[in-house]
């Protein structure tokens, strides 16, 4: 997957790809949710 010829065809691989959108729409809320759960562990009285 990391062997894609980016140097020969730079215009076929923009920044916002389907894989980029899928990773960030799943990853960003997941990391935020895990961070919120971890932060809640320290709020206990």
Swiss-Prot record:
One Gene Ontology term of the molecular function aspect: iron ion binding
One cellular component (GO) term of this entry: photosystem II reaction center
Cofactor binding description: With its partner (PsbE) binds heme. PSII binds additional chlorophylls, carotenoids and specific lipids.
Lineage: Bacteria, Bacillati, Cyanobacteriota, Cyanophyceae, Synechococcales
Alphabetized InterPro entries for the sequence: PSII_cyt_b559_bsu, PSII_cyt_b559_CS, PSII_cyt_b559_N
Chain sites annotated for binding heme: 24
Membrane spanning stretches: 20-36
Main subcellular location of this protein, as a coarse class: membrane
Lipid bilayer topology: Single-pass membrane protein
Keywords: Electron transport, Heme, Iron, Membrane, Metal-binding, Photosynthesis, Photosystem II, Thylakoid, Transmembrane, Transmembrane helix, Transport
Cofactor dependence: heme b
Localization, UniProt: Cellular thylakoid membrane
Pfam families: Cytochrom_B559
Gene: psbF
GO BP terms, alphabetized: photosynthetic electron transport chain
Family in the record: Belongs to the PsbE/PsbF family.
Quaternary data: Heterodimer of an alpha subunit and a beta subunit. PSII is composed of 1 copy each of membrane proteins PsbA, PsbB, PsbC, PsbD, PsbE, PsbF, PsbH, PsbI, PsbJ, PsbK, PsbL, PsbM, PsbT, PsbX, PsbY, PsbZ, Psb30/Ycf12, peripheral proteins PsbO, CyanoQ (PsbQ), PsbU, PsbV and a large number of cofactors. It forms dimeric complexes.
Protein name: Cytochrome b559 subunit beta
């Amino acid at each position: 997957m990391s062997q894609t010829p980016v140097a020969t065809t730079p215009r076929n691989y923009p920044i916002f790809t389907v894989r980029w959108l899928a990773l960030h729409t799943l990853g960003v809320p997941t990391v935020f949710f895990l961070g919120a759960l971890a932060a809640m562990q320290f709020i206990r009285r």
